[in-house]
Amino acid sequence: MRRPLEVKLCPNIYMVKDTGVKILGSSLKNRNILLAISGGIAATESVKLSRELRRYQADVTIMMSKEAEKIITPLAVSWASDNEVVTDWNSKMHQLDSYDAVIVAPATRNTISKHIHGIMDSPIMMALSAARGKDTPILFIPSMHKDLFDDPVTQDLISILISQGSEVLLEEENENKIKQPSPLHIVAKLCNMVNKKLPNRKKVAITLGANRAPIDAVRAIQNASSGQTGWIISEYLYRQGHDIVCIVGKTTVHPNFPLPDVRFGGSPESMLSTCFGVASDKIPPEAWIHAAAVLDYYMHPEDGKKSSGSENWEITLSPGPKHILELSPLVKGSIRIGFKLETGVSDQDLIDKAFEQISKYGLDAVIANMKEQVHDPNFPRGRVVRPDGSVKLLETYEILCAEVDSIISNS
């Protein structure tokens, strides 16, 4: 899977040696992670997975089963993790160390069965038993042929794992196999598992992308928005342990990994209706981020297709409902962050308009942007304006995301 957004997050951090990695975030900084590699063919993905863990600053300990060594060498995994690999019993007994989380990838049915039945015939199995005893988060990544996965015994084993408090991450069937998810997806899931224990984690709804409205049966008008900023914020907050609901319009950029709760609403009406549905959830969001480019003006579409011709076609656009205003009665007490995009105005005018939006809708903050500056690396990524009149420059996406997280977590 491509990673179109990574350079903008940490642009000034580079590799300094052959085993080095580009740092993309700090979601696993100072976290001790055990990666247990069992003997599935997906063990070949261990190099990529180890390096992805390190991109988020995890301290990675690797254990490999004897079967895994038949598929990939400890030397390759040691290079990827920049650490020694435990392949057999030794006096250091790393399997009894304390870890912030354990990943079993790939998790063969044999390994899952042994863990459930308490068999400790290898360092990996002892480490898993100790982790369960310490209530350490464990993430299993089953990978096997579809026929084996569909065996009722396998399904029972997975159900037992979940009932014991472990988490299981599955990829959709591909080539009649349940393959291992991408390293990006696995590490994002792990970040969420580890960081959800941090204080003040919240359910956060974020609108993103553009609205489109028809003017006849084949033509439409649409705001300019790729959805990039919304996806970046969503991924960051998910990694930080928040429960994220994405309300998505029309986008040209896609997330780097599947987020767990994505709901769609491309037109202004359908996006607002989806927002109403989210606000009415049994457990409603405690925070809202209004990052979508909502279509403020649109029309009732003409019937059929207007015939092509040389004459002018005059249309009348009428103002639509303001989503932030319409949602207000349903989200009282929630943290709310708006976005303000302007063009051709001074910095002070932009800030004044952002502060006006805060005052008008009772927002906790507004991220203010100049259209001419959004994609220009010579300008900051935005400015955050607060109700007290303070303004803070946001130089990078990483700083923008961290500021949004701070507002949500500390309000």
Predicted regions and their residues:
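A cross-family phosphate/adenosyl-ligand binding-site feature
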Residues: 2-411
